Amino acid sequence: MVKLKGLRQINPYVAGQQPNERDMIKLNTNENAYGPSPKVAEALQNFDDQELRKYSSLDQTELCQALAANLGVSPDQLIIGNGSDDILSMAFLAFFNSGESVLFPDLTYGFYKVWADLYHVPFREIPLTDDFEVHPSDYFGDNGGIILANPNAPTGIYLPLEQLEEILASNQDVVVVVDEAYIHFGGQSALPLLETYPNLFITRTFSKDAALAGLRVGYGLGHPDLIAVMKAVKDSINPYSVDLLAESLALAAVQDWDYYLETGRAIQETRDWFAGELAALDFQVLTSQTNFVLAQPSGISAAELFQQLEERRIYVRYFPKAERIKDFLRISIGRREEMETVLAAIEEICSS
């Protein structure tokens, strides 16, 4: 590496691979196999390309209004970003500046640790229980803020709302960020708690429920004072982070939310069926409220099963460097026919 003063040494986030092969089954990055609403395709077809000569809007007013109506909040409780990763990254800059350690689980979304390191935010990883669950009392006491994915990733386990409220009630002097990337697939949202807890900030994405991972749109919800701080950070980095096309297509998705409710139910039904089939093969399957399952194979190592599935062009996620789940595979939930193919492949591999 070239030797120059001031270069930063960073341990970056490691994303799932993005293979591009014909006849593959891609179940490694929790994408929505059902695709966007037909209304999104219609909006794309009707988009005026002359609009692209302009800068995007600063506040995505129309999208905020549609989301607010859909979610039962006011527009001043919303901020739109370039994916929920953008919102979460800005949250670290906006909320975690006390000098005290920010708390998050030892087994969760890997970006939290990366952002803490990148922005020089002290942090402490709180071990999940032996059952991979969050224990609320572990988050009591002095800290500089808390961030929890609920349902958690990569475990898929949901923290009941009453337990989340215990954490909020015990930490009213700091911001508690709840990452709801997967809330569409099970569990109860923390949205009803916004009115009671001004220290609550919720993040959501269009990547999972709305099948728009390639578009990059996400949003945050919180007290207007928190949103004001977030917008100040956004305007200090890139006020035009949400492009016009993304805003237009995300709006079309919100306006056809019944479509996503239907596909969400289909994913949940397929997930529960698939988890049951894996359990019948003596796999240890964690109870998931997401669009994936985390499972420990029986009679074969996770590494071997991962390799043999890949040889069949079936891509799942393996975490060899995560000690607590190095014997597990995370498998996204596709359409029923895809999952039947995956199950048949697993049965064949395990019986050979």
Swiss-Prot record:
GO biological process terms, semicolon-separated: L-histidine biosynthetic process
Top enzyme category: transferase
Catalyzed reactions per annotation: L-histidinol phosphate + 2-oxoglutarate = 3-(imidazol-4-yl)-2-oxopropyl phosphate + L-glutamate
Modified-residue entries (N6-(pyridoxal phosphate)lysine), positions: 208
InterPro entries cross-referenced by the UniProt entry: Aminotransferase_I/II_large, HisP_aminotrans, HistidinolP_aminotransfase, PyrdxlP-dep_Trfase, PyrdxlP-dep_Trfase_major, PyrdxlP-dep_Trfase_small
Pathway noted in the entry: Amino-acid biosynthesis; L-histidine biosynthesis; L-histidine from 5-phospho-alpha-D-ribose 1-diphosphate: step 7/9
Keywords associated with the record: Amino-acid biosynthesis, Aminotransferase, Histidine biosynthesis, Pyridoxal phosphate, Transferase
Cofactor(s), names only, from the UniProt record: pyridoxal 5'-phosphate
GO molecular function annotation: histidinol-phosphate transaminase activity; pyridoxal phosphate binding
EC number: 2.6.1.9
PANTHER family linked to this entry: HISTIDINOL-PHOSPHATE AMINOTRANSFERASE, HISTIDINOL-PHOSPHATE AMINOTRANSFERASE 2
Similarity field: Belongs to the class-II pyridoxal-phosphate-dependent aminotransferase family. Histidinol-phosphate aminotransferase subfamily.
Annotated HAMAP family: HisC_aminotrans_2
Record's subunit section: Homodimer.
This protein's name: Histidinol-phosphate aminotransferase
Organism: Streptococcus sanguinis (strain SK36)
